[in-house]
């Protein structure tokens, strides 16, 4: 199974959550990247405020580490309301969700991370709450049990998921605002790195920020994590300032190459190239070849490699592209 402390993994690790929180933008105007999403949100939020209504329910989906939680916080700030946060696996019983819903005030945001992992029982309770702002509660047990309806104040449910396809159709259909987050480009990531460095009181030049951004796999969470490790290197081995050369040396030492790949990415690509002659290779065979679970390959390793054009996913299996061969100084056979 893939190591939990893999430096360039997009999932939270260590002190990420605490540190990310300190670096998060609070308003849309402070938020970098995702231009289409930001433009849409500005319109939806302003319209809801003009009508003095709760914002429509929102589903934010995309790979981990791109800012889904940050956007939920920004929505609450822009609307001037409170936000209550939880996650799908935490809501084990209907009563867990009912306790949250009954404590919401008008217009508040309820943020559910990993919403695709809601249990069916909890999801059933959510339907009338989302549609009619009503909560159906069973009182008593057995033949004496009866259902009562509680009115809820209008609220906004913001669901976040890395696997939108895993949501049930009835739940997905109840979100009026679906927003997909994409991997960030180097320019936007450089801006994020520079801003984070300012928050940390770290001297960094534009080339140093760009070098970190290039190796951050299009993901702000990874960029901030790499920035912290480069800072360590700069303070111990240099004068504390981050330049391109300092960033290069630090990230090379950490085994994060110019494309943002670590040994697991290279292991996956070389398995396709060397063991399966470039592919196509099925997911199960590939998982066995590198000793990983198929879900890890699909959810953690593949998305960035596909998005960057190093792997093609075809009906017959995975294929290493010409770009993958060039990365290792090889020529793809005809």
Curated annotation (Swiss-Prot):
It catalyses: ATP + H2O = ADP + phosphate + H(+). Mg(2+) binds at residue 69. It comes from the Bacteria. Its EC number is 3.6.4.-. Residues 258-334 are annotated as: Head domain (RuvB-H). GO terms for molecular function: ATP binding; ATP hydrolysis activity; four-way junction DNA binding; four-way junction helicase activity. Residues 185-255 are annotated as: Small ATPAse domain (RuvB-S). ATP binds at residues 24, 65, 68-70, 131-133, 174, 184, 221. InterPro entries: AAA+_ATPase (IPR003593), AAA_lid_4 (IPR041445), DNA_helicase_Holl-junc_RuvB (IPR004605), P-loop_NTPase (IPR027417), RuvB-like_N (IPR008824), RuvB_C (IPR008823), WH-like_DNA-bd_sf (IPR036388), WH_DNA-bd_sf (IPR036390). SUPFAM superfamilies: P-loop containing nucleoside triphosphate hydrolases, Winged helix' DNA-binding domain. It is found in: Cytoplasm. Homohexamer. Forms an RuvA(8)-RuvB(12)-Holliday junction (HJ) complex. HJ DNA is sandwiched between 2 RuvA tetramers; dsDNA enters through RuvA and exits via RuvB. An RuvB hexamer assembles on each DNA strand where it exits the tetramer. Each RuvB hexamer is contacted by two RuvA subunits (via domain III) on 2 adjacent RuvB subunits; this complex drives branch migration. In the full resolvosome a probable DNA-RuvA(4)-RuvB(12)-RuvC(2) complex forms which resolves the HJ. HAMAP family: DNA_HJ_migration_RuvB (MF_00016). This is Holliday junction branch migration complex subunit RuvB.
């Amino acid at each position: 199974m893939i190591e939990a402390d893999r430096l360039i993994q997009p999932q939270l690790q260590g002190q990420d959550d605490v540190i990310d929180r300190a670096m998060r933008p609070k308003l849309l105007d402070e938020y970098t990247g995702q231009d289409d999403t930001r433009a849409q949100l500005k319109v939806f939020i302003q319209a809801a405020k003009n009508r003095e209504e709760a914002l429509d329910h929102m589903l934010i989906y995309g790979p981990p580490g791109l800012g889904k939680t940050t956007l939920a916080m920004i929505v609450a700030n822009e609307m001037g309301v409170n936000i209550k946060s939880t996650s799908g696996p935490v809501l084990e019983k209907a009563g867990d969700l009912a306790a949250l819903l009954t404590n919401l005030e008008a217009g508040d945001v309820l943020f559910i991370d990993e919403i695709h992992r809601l249990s069916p029982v909890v999801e059933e309770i959510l339907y009338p709450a989302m549609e009619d702002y009503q909560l159906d509660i069973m009182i008593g047990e057995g033949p004496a049990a009866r259902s009562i309806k509680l009115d809820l104040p209008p609220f906004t449910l913001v669901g976040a998921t890395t696997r939108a396809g895993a949501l049930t159709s009835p739940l997905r259909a109840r979100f009026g605002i679906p927003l997909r987050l994409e991997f960030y480009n180097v320019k936007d990531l450089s801006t994020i790195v520079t801003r984070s460095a300012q928050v940390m009181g770290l001297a960094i030049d534009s080339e140093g920020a760009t070098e970190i951004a290039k190796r951050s796999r299009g993901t702000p969470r990874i960029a901030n994590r790499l920035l912290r490790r480069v800072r360590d290197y700069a303070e111990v081995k240099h004068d504390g300032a981050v330049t391109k050369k300092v960033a290069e040396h630090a990230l090379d030492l950490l085994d994060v190459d110019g494309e943002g790949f670590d040994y697991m990415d290279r292991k996956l690509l070389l398995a396709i190239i060397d063991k399966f002659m470039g592919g196509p290779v099925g997911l199960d065979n590939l998982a066995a070849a590198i000793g990983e679970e198929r879900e890890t390959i699909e959810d953690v390793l593949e998305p960035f490699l596909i998005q960057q054009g190093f792997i093609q996913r075809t009906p017959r299996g995975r294929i290493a592209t010409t770009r993958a061969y060039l990365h290792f100084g090889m020529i793809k056979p005809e």
